[in-house]
Each structure stands twice: as structure tokens, then as C-alpha cells.
Amino acid sequence: MTDKIRTLQGRVVSDKMEKSIVVAIERFVKHPIYGKFIKRTTKLHVHDENNECGTGDVVEIRECRPLSKTKSWTLVRVVEKAVL
């Protein structure tokens, strides 16, 4: 049995916590009746050990063991810094 570690890419929505960020993941879901593709957003709490992310950054995250009640993802790298 092979365990593939899930990795996702999203945008940082909040960086106000110490060593934690909130990342919004956008995905498209087909409506069951009408067939139109709808944009859905999932917010995930992510562990940021070095506090290197800011709001608006595009980041890559991966799944890990539960670190707290809501955190079970960790930061892999910052793909793109936000332009302020």
C-alpha cells in the first residue's frame, strides 16, 4: 500500500497568528442538476514554522499529522510573493 502525501496550492488569506496561516484553496465543482461549473473555496489552517508568509502570497502546502485541533497541513514553499 502506497501513501501519497497530498499537496495543494492556494492563496494566503490571513497571517495574523503566530506560526500559522490560513490558506484559501479554490476548486471548480459541477452543479448536479444544471451542469454549470461553480467556484468553491476551502480554507485550511497551515503551519508556518518561520513566519515567512504574508497575506496574498501563493503557497504550496502538504498534508501532515494533526498539529492541533484545526491544523493538519504544513507549508512547503512560497510560490509567489504578493505585490503590495
From Swiss-Prot:
Q: Which GO terms describe its biological process?
A: translation
- Which UniProt keyword terms apply here? Ribonucleoprotein, Ribosomal protein, RNA-binding, rRNA-binding
* Highest taxon of the lineage: Bacteria
Give a GO molecular function annotation for the protein: rRNA binding
InterPro entries under this entry?
NA-bd_OB-fold (IPR012340), Ribosomal_uS17 (IPR000266), Ribosomal_uS17_bact/chlr (IPR019984), Ribosomal_uS17_CS (IPR019979)
**GO CC terms, sorted:** cytosolic small ribosomal subunit
CDD domains registered for this protein in UniProt: Ribosomal_uS17
Family matches, as PROSITE patterns: RIBOSOMAL_S17
Q: Name one Pfam family in it.
A: Ribosomal_S17
- Ranges annotated as spanning the membrane: none
What quaternary arrangement does the UniProt entry report?
A: Part of the 30S ribosomal subunit.
Family, as annotated: Belongs to the universal ribosomal protein uS17 family.
Please describe what this protein does. Answer: One of the primary rRNA binding proteins, it binds specifically to the 5'-end of 16S ribosomal RNA.
Q: What is this protein called?
A: Small ribosomal subunit protein uS17
